[in-house]
């Protein structure tokens, strides 16, 4: 995924599209993640997504659902923004 992407549009299971603002991209243990928040919505929580490749080699975003993986991304995110 390009580091200069500011927004992405994701489609849920029901076909509803939502635009998200990309807060940051993180490289952790040979995996790439993006942290996003819904654009134009009052939300306090960010969403962590892992960048994977599908069978065709195209990038796809996968929600981080495992607690251990989520905690690792959250820790890296907090460390990054505590340094600013």
Swiss-Prot record:
Pfam families: DUF1292 (PF06949). It comes from the Bacteria. InterPro entries: UPF0473 (IPR009711). Belongs to the UPF0473 family. This is UPF0473 protein CLJ_B2791. It comes from Clostridium botulinum (strain 657 / Type Ba4).
């Amino acid at each position: 995924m390009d580091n200069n992407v500011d927004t992405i549009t994701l489609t849920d299971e029901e076909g509803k599209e939502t635009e998200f603002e990309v807060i940051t991209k993180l490289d952790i243990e040979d995996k790439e993640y993006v942290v996003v928040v819904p654009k134009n919505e009052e939300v306090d929580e960010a969403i962590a997504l892992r960048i994977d490749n599908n069978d065709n080699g195209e990038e796809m975003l996968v929600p981080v659902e495992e607690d251990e993986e989520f905690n690792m991304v959250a820790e890296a995110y907090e460390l990054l923004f505590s340094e600013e």
